[in-house]
UniProtKB/Swiss-Prot annotation:
Organism: Clostridium perfringens (strain SM101 / Type A)
Annotated binding of Mg(2+) 4, by residue: E835, N837
Pathway annotation from the record: Amino-acid biosynthesis; L-arginine biosynthesis; carbamoyl phosphate from bicarbonate: step 1/1; Pyrimidine metabolism; UMP biosynthesis via de novo pathway; (S)-dihydroorotate from bicarbonate: step 1/3
Record-given protein name: Carbamoyl phosphate synthase large chain
Domain MGS-like, first and last residues per copy: 933-1067
Function: Large subunit of the glutamine-dependent carbamoyl phosphate synthetase (CPSase). CPSase catalyzes the formation of carbamoyl phosphate from the ammonia moiety of glutamine, carbonate, and phosphate donated by ATP, constituting the first step of 2 biosynthetic pathways, one leading to arginine and/or urea and the other to pyrimidine nucleotides.
InterPro entries linked to this entry: ATP-grasp (IPR011761), ATP_grasp_subdomain_1 (IPR013815), CarbamoylP_synth_lsu (IPR006275), CarbamoylP_synth_lsu_oligo (IPR005480), CarbamoylP_synth_lsu_oligo_sf (IPR036897), CbamoylP_synth_lsu-like_ATP-bd (IPR005479), CbamoylP_synth_lsu_CPSase_dom (IPR005483), MGS-like_dom (IPR011607)
A molecular-function term among this protein's GO annotations: carbamoyl-phosphate synthase (glutamine-hydrolyzing) activity
SMART domains linked: CPSase_L_D3, MGS
């Protein structure tokens, strides 16, 4: 059946900011869906609050509303645009929940908007735990013994009846949020309370634990005529009990018998038919490893993280096909873009193995509880493709960028067998290395399988890898022959791993490979196991025979991607990479992308001329460059992952376009950079590197407190802190030198000024600054965690002139051709430079969208030799728009147990939203709403615990808050000072004192906002840490910067929260 002619204008709801459990996969699926709709001549209206996405670009939708994803604001868009249809399944859990809410509140009926694709009734049957369980019982699909729980007492009673352990699964939440495994009543009370609070309908499913069973997933498609196919099945190497987002996953499944495979496939199709899915659906099963017993865990009646993985693993574009089905097409009418011959009703066939490994953020949260369970904690993931499991798995390990190239990890060498067993039984992000060490020491495979729930098939593969590592370590380079080296390469060993074990350099192994003609061949991902010729140039490396790459003589450029999503290097860099590829293709240049992230738009095979799904290591990148012989490589847009390849590529005489490794060194080496600033007469905060506690204290006395301290070599502000006195500095330096005595600690005078940021473009002669951004929080809060305003609101014309002058001088002196990011501080009327990055930064998507300057496109054309003056955007500072746009960071700390919440010099946010308004107050209010921050709309009781350095400033703000009708609760010191200022304050006892104390008030949700300025962040022994954690875990607003509080006060004084706010189409 062809296109439904009644559908002319479709509203697509995006997924909002990147958070743990909902990452870049929805930018990929949303972009695909929008493009599929536009292909059919349908007008696309997009609502999404996330400015860092490709899907919010003017090329992707006809109208783009970067507005909060709430019923209030989406209704305004519907009222203004009058779409006839709504596509709900492309925006993750956020989009699904919002669609259900719009339906239930009668808004869709009010404006006559039809839901296309999977219906609201089907969504409810998939998402509501009780409806889903009843449906499974009706179609005789086994479910785990369970009960729908809406209050604590009935949960406790049911758990006593079925016995522990039990699993808590909240309804309508994301990534297992609020859920977990409870082994006893005490744990149940804690987990159940959290789950009931965080479920949007106050409902959880309490079920008997089948921890240790295999977890199997099927990705299924169904059209409105009842045609069904399974796109892909996937096997979690980790058993049930670890969230699938935190599990290592392999596709296709490796350990299922044909009977098990067909049994679960049939069950998937029965389920998707019963629920009435129209589009894509993910079905998760628990399978007893010792029998054919299975149970349905849950379904996702939408595109998901798993569907993005299945799309990339097979080449089957699930989101695109789902969008076409929503328009009325049948699977047998939708062409397969990979082959150009077959149709979407053909089930993909895989003749390779795919492995997904999660990327966790624990490097940013040293004190975090790393034990994995039913709550997802990974920020991103990598995918690796190989001709066998071992090859894909080792590619995956080196793709994680954790400095590991094999299964050996030094930290596990000295552990006793008992300690290793504990690390394996309570799995964390490093379990695979502990498990490998157990196998290395000869621990019986059947025993390892028993205690981990990991199938013997995988353990035998790991043991083989470990045994080969041991053989290498007992050998020399002279023992290595062609046959052995070829076997190792076929099983995924990198040159570096082999070299490390033989104690030679990787270049030596590369030389031997060259002599013995051991070069990788590249195979195509074609969806059909080679049965039909494929049109999509989408490749993975193998050391088997037959190469499927056709190398052209065209002018070509390699673009290095940014790898997995992590804190400090998020979706913004994928945005930049994709725009670079688009710009190159417009210029007629063949583009080759290398990346390994299955969630992103850059790894959609339709984006570039060729896609290599490979690790971003020196060897893997060099192999592709050797094969393709490009005219240049672009590193500027792939974040630190790409930039760190600059020196290696220079050594190999491979040309990089834009910034060179020498320019990177000049910007990042402190001494060289200080010399440059001195020559240019540009100020920076005074400071130096110190090697001891005594030297550090002496330097601090010379500079005067407060002092910013940090390790020498850090990314994303890792390990940075502001110290206010000698006691704090001594504490920091003592710990820092204990961790690393081989490198200096950098000590800078901390200037408590206004932070200013620019992304600029230089062609070596002229400089264009698309916009000057102002950070709301003063210097000392990492730029990625600060609220950012454009146009700048509080900067004088003189400072703006200095910003442009310094930017020009730095860009031209460093020799930038392309992009440069500079961060400044304005302190007491003077401008200081604090950081220069000779590459794209995380603010590029934001400033591109709100200034209207296509920054990446221009920077790419400059790298190809064009000049700014010829590109139509002028030079100097670009004209400011009428609307004000505020970028607000979004944090996922609620999902990570025992991690710090407070703002500081180390970045912690995972995503961002945009607020757009006629003035800064309207924009701030929208930003606060979009980021789910406290706005004062629902309650006005503030708990204030303020450090001594901040009390004077807080007292001024509290007077305004008092006038605005806020109530204060505070501990003795702050309460007394509030009363002295004429403000009524209720006194509360400290933690540890008799009830009711601070923690009781938080647990009982008698507080609406916690304002807590930390004395020492990252110190889990302090009361402040526990107050912040307790509040965030109960969805109570927390502000740790008085600048954020001041913004709240200002927008309330201006009445932005009471005003009828417009929504803006940014195209």
């Amino acid at each position: 059946m062809p296109l439904n002619k009644d559908i002319k204008k479709v509203l697509v709801i995006g997924s909002g900011p990147i958070i743990i459990g909902q990452a870049a996969e929805f930018d990929y699926s949303g972009t695909q869906a929008c493009q599929a709709l536009k292909e059919e001549g349908i007008e696309v209206v997009l609502v999404n609050s996330n400015p860092a996405t490709i899907m919010t670009d003017k090329e992707i939708a006809d109208k783009v509303y970067l507005e909060p994803l709430t019923v209030e604001f989406v209704e305004k868009v519907i009222e203004k645009e009058r779409p006839d249809s709504l596509l709900a399944g492309m925006g993750g859990q956020t989009g699904l929940n919002l669609a259900v809410e719009l339906y239930e509140k009668g808004i869709l009926d009010k404006y006559n908007v039809k839901v296309i694709g999977t219906s609201i009734e089907s969504i409810k049957e998939g998402e509501d735990r009780e409806l889903f369980r009843d449906m499974m019982n009706r179609i005789n699909q086994p479910v785990i013994q369970s009960e729908i729980i809406t209050d604590l007492d009935s949960g406790i009673a049911f758990a006593r009846k079925i016995g522990y352990p039990v699993i808590v699964r909240p309804a309508y939440t994301l990534g297992g949020t609020g859920g977990g495994i409870a082994n006893n009543e005490e744990e149940l009370i804690e987990t159940l309370t959290s789950g009931l609070q965080l479920s949007t309908i106050g409902q959880v499913l309490l079920e008997k634990s089948v921890k240790g069973w295999k977890e199997i997933e099927y990705e299924v498609m169904r059209d409105s005529f009842g045609n069904c196919i399974t796109v892909c099945n996937m096997e979690n190497i980790d058993p049930v009990g670890i969230h699938t987002g935190d599990s290592i996953v392999v596709a296709p499944s490796q350990t299922l018998s044909d009977k098990e495979y067909q049994m679960l496939r049939s069950a998937s199709i029965d389920i998707i038919n019963a629920v009435g899915i129209k589009g894509g659906c993910n079905v998760q099963f628990a399978l007893n490893p010792h029998s054919f017993e299975y149970a349905v865990i849950e379904i996702n009646p939408r595109v998901s993280r798993s569907s993005a993985l299945a799309s990339k693993a097979t080449g089957y574009p699930i989101a695109k096909v789902a969008a076409k089905i929503a328009l009325g097409y049948g699977l047998d009418e939708i062409k397969n873009a990979v082959t150009g011959m077959t149709y979407a009703c053909f089930e993909p066939s895989l003749d390779y193995v795919v492995v997904k490994i999660p990327k966790w953020p624990f490097d940013k949260f040293q004190g975090a509880d790393r034990v994995l369970g039913t709550k997802m904690m990974a920020t991103g993931e990598i995918m690796a493709i190989g001709s066998n499991f071992e090859a894909a798995f080792l590619k995956g390990i080196r793709s994680l960028e954790i400095g590991k190239y094999s299964l050996e990890h030094k930290k596990f060498k000295d552990l006793s067998m008992y300690e290793l067993r504990e690390r394996v039984v309570s799995p964390d992000d490093e379990r695979i290395f502990a498990l490998a060490e157990m196998l290395r020491r000869g621990y019986r495979i059947d025993m390892v399988s028993k205690i981990t729930g990991i199938d013997i098939f995988f353990l035998e593969k790991f043991r083989w890898l470990v045994e080969e590592e041991q053989k290498l370590k007992q050998s020399t380079i002279d023992d290595l022959n062609r046959e052995w080296l070829l076997k190792l390469k076929r099983r995924g060993f990198s040159d570096k791993a082999i070299a490390d074990m033989l104690k030679v350099s990787p270049d030596e192994i590369y030389r031997l490979r060259d002599i013995w003609h051991i070069k990788p061949s590249y195979k195509m991902v074609d969806t059909c196991g080679g049965e039909f010729e494929a049109l999509s140039p989408y490749y993975y490396s193998t050391y088997e025979q037959y190469d499927e790459v056709v190398v052209s003589d065209n002018k070509k450029v390699v673009v290095i991607g940014s790898g997995p999503i992590r804190i400090g290097q998020g979706i913004e860099f994928d945005y930049a990479s994709v725009h670079c590829v688009m710009a190159l293709r417009k210029q007629g240049i063949e583009t080759i992308v290398i990346n390994n992230n299955p969630e992103t738009v850059s790894t959609d095979f339709s984006i570039s001329d060729k896609l290599y799904f490979e690790p971003l290591t020196e060897e893997d990148v060099l192999n592709i460059i050797d094969k393709e012989n490009p005219d240049g490589v672009i590193l500027q847009f792939g974040g630190q992952t790409a930039i760190k390849l600059a020196k290696f590529l220079k050594e190999k005489n491979i040309p990089t376009l834009g910034t060179t490794s020498d320019q990177i060194d000049l910007a990042e080496d402190r001494e060289q950079f200080d010399d440059l600033l001195e020559r240019l007469n540009i100020a920076r905060p005074k400071g130096k590197g110190v090697w001891s506690l005594e030297e550090g204290l002496e330097e601090a006395r010379r500079l005067g407190f407060p002092i910013l301290v940090r390790p020498s070599f850090v990314l994303g502000g890792q390990g940075m802190e502001i110290t206010h006195d000698e006691e704090e500095l001594t504490y920091y330096l003592t710990n820092a030198f204990e961790k690393d005595s081989k490198n200096p600690i950098l000590i800078d005078k901390y200037l408590m000024g206004r932070e200013i940021e620019v992304d600029a473009i230089s062609d070596g002669e002229d400089v264009l600054v698309p916009g000057i951004m102002e950070h709301l929080e003063r210097a000392g809060v990492h730029s990625g965690d600060s609220i950012t305003m454009y146009p700048a609101q509080n900067i004088s014309d003189k400072i703006k002139e200095d910003v442009l002058d310094y930017t020009k001088k730095l860009a031209l002196s460093i020799g930038i051709k392309g992009m440069i990011n500079i961060q400044f501080i304005e302190f007491e009327g003077k401008l200081y430079v604090i950081e220069v990055n000779p590459r794209a930064s995380r603010t590029v998507p934001y400033i591109s969208k709100v200034s209207g300057v296509p920054i990446v496109d221009i920077a790419t054309r400059i790298m190809l030799g064009e000049k700014l003056k010829d590109l139509g955007y002028g030079t100097g500072v670009y004209k400011e728009p009428e609307l004000v746009s505020v970028k607000v960071p979004v944090f996922s700390t609620q999902k990570l147990p025992n991690v710090e919440v407070s703002l500081g010099p180390e970045m912690r946010s995972t995503g961002e939203v945009l607020g757009v308004g006629r003035n800064v107050f309207e924009a701030l209010y929208k930003g606060f709403v979009g980021a789910s921050m406290y706005t004062g709309d629902k309650g006005k009781t503030i708990l204030a615990t303020i450090k001594k350095h901040d009390k004077k400033e807080f007292m001024e703000l509290s007077k305004d808050l008092d006038k605005l009708g806020y109530n204060f609760i505070a501990t003795t010191g702050t309460a007394n000072e509030l009363r002295e200022a004429g403000i009524d304050a209720k006194e509360v006892r400290r933690i540890g004192e008799e009830s009711p104390n601070i923690m009781d008030l938080i647990k009982n949700k008698e507080i609406d906002l916690v304002v807590n300025t930390p004395t020492k962040a990252n110190d889990s022994k302090r009361d402040g840490f526990h107050i912040r954690r307790a509040a965030i875990e109960r969805n109570i607003g927390v502000m740790t910067s008085l600048d954020t509080l001041k913004a709240l006060v200002e927008l309330q004084k201006e009445g932005a929260h009471n005003r009828e706010l417009e929504v803006f189409n940014l195209i």
